[in-house]
Amino acid sequence: MVMEVDEPAVAATTSQNQPQEHANDFDMDTSEGPIENDETFEPVDQINWKFNQVKGNIDADVHTEADVISCVEFSHDGEYLATGDKGGRVVIFQRDQSGKYVKGVRSREYNVYSTFQSHEPEFDYLKSLEIDEKINQIRWLKKKNAANFILSTNDKTIKLWKISERERKIGDDAWNLPRTNRINTSSFRGRLQIPSIVPMELIVEASPRRVYGNAHTYHVNSISVNSDQETFLSADDLRVNLWNLEITNESFNIVDIKPANMEELTEVITAAEFHPTQCNWFVYSSSKGSIRLCDMRDRALCDAYAKIFEEPEDPQSRSFFSEIIASVSDVKFSHNGRYLLTRDYLTVKVWDLNMESQPVETYPVHNYLRTKLCALYENDSIFDKFECDWSGDDKHILTGSYHNLFRSYARGNNQDAKTWEARPQEPHSQLRSRFVVPSAKRKRNNLSSSGETTEEDLSSDQLQFDRKILHTAWHPKDNIIALAATNNLYIFSDV
């Protein structure tokens, strides 16, 4: 049951019919804790990635559609890495616990920790629609005790899972009665024994704790846990709902952009996320390229945003594809809460929360595809939704592309952006960067100081659009990245 509330949750400082006036008063106070000092960003050096691991069968012909990875997410401390796939399964990896060190740092290998079936295929008999088991997103809750908790969602249903360990049991020789079906009265004679606890092989159990359903008419595209660790939001194409983790049968509708007449629909919600420290703030992005920042203290139904971030369109460059490639596929707050990172089809942008008119940084991802938009439209690749990520220190940016290529950017150093290809090679060996050129006419080799080739040309005509990196994750503390390439999970680091 979704509760639509029109009354203000908290008394607002301005009238509800004056959202623009309120928006002018909504300024980020950089003197408070959540938003760090207003610094001029210093350029940083590019990271040279090294291959660590690849999970899954690397034979391109040996996988099913259910094996395709659909989401990747590190835990808050980086000790665990969760993936979901189109078959409804969740696989959790744990960082190596053996104490092994590589080049003076703790091993950055991840091993399988737990695998379980999160969602099953369903059928909506009321609408005669099949509901896929595909996992759309996974979000970790902050660890409070020995157990871990994650939220996972498919198109309709969100589930809370508890991941716990069991490595001790009651010893078989510590019973006062024989462990048989028949009771022998003579067995009661003798001394009373106290059961003893003995070690056993580690068992990791995943148990469902809550199921949040029946609140979304359209497909859920985002979930985000609030900084208070008590509530979370879920977003579909037209609505954003607020949930309490302890309550499964009701949620509060906090954004509703559905028009009275669906023929007047001009945009849909593509992603939503809570601020990392301010529990009242959240953002949601749209298919028209705008990002809206909302404050739940203003009103319960946040249809009137506090700020809107959008870049004016150049009329000279407008085409049939302009609105499609402007659609924001992912939005992420920086760890310090000061910036927003957004990804559209061709670029990654960094927005300052204090400047709505234009991004402070724009990084091209694959501009060489601009001349191929017609072909990409015909094969539906233009609708692919790429994710983006911040590094733990907010100084680097990560996103994916086609042909299993990915790009990382050193902020403030746009000229030093490099492209790498996710492919198996020797552990801890440096990746060779790729340079995509419009045609295969030009070849160049850049040599490292050791004389090894570090860059390879790749013609844009050779790109394989069915091999793509849509889902990415960056370790919250170390320079470790995880990339989903079809059914493979690649892990790279700077060591």
Swiss-Prot record:
Its main location: cytoplasm. This is Serine/threonine-protein phosphatase 2A regulatory subunit sur-6. Residues 12-21 have a biased composition (Polar residues). It comes from the Eukaryota. Part of a complex consisting of a common heterodimeric core enzyme, composed of catalytic subunit let-92 and constant regulatory subunit paa-1, that associates with a variety of regulatory subunits which confer distinct properties to the holoenzyme. Interacts with let-92. Belongs to the phosphatase 2A regulatory subunit B family. Pfam families: WD40. Changing residue 302 to Y: In ku123; viable with no visible phenotype. Suppresses multivulva formation in a let-60 n1046 mutant background. GO terms for biological process: centriole assembly; embryo development ending in birth or egg hatching; nematode larval development; positive regulation of vulval development; regulation of vulval development. GO terms for cellular component: cytosol; protein phosphatase type 2A complex. Disruption phenotype: RNAi-mediated knockdown causes severe embryonic lethality. In mutants, during the first embryonic divisions, P1 cell initiates division prior to AB cell, spindles appear abnormal or collapse during anaphase and chromatin bridges and supernumerary centrosomes are often detected. Probable regulatory subunit of serine/threonine phosphatase let-92. Together with let-92 and constant regulatory subunit paa-1, positively regulates centriole duplication during early embryonic cell divisions by preventing the degradation of sas-5 and kinase zyg-1. In addition, during vulva development, may play a role with phosphatase let-92 and regulatory subunit paa-1 in the induction of vulva cell precursors by positively regulating let-60/Ras-MAP kinase signaling, probably by promoting lin-45 activation. Keywords: Cytoplasm, Repeat, WD repeat. WD repeats lie at residues 64-103, 130-171, 215-253, 264-304, 323-361, 378-419, 464-495. Residues 1-27, 439-459 are annotated as: Disordered. It is found in: Cytoplasm. One of its GO terms (molecular function) is protein phosphatase regulator activity.
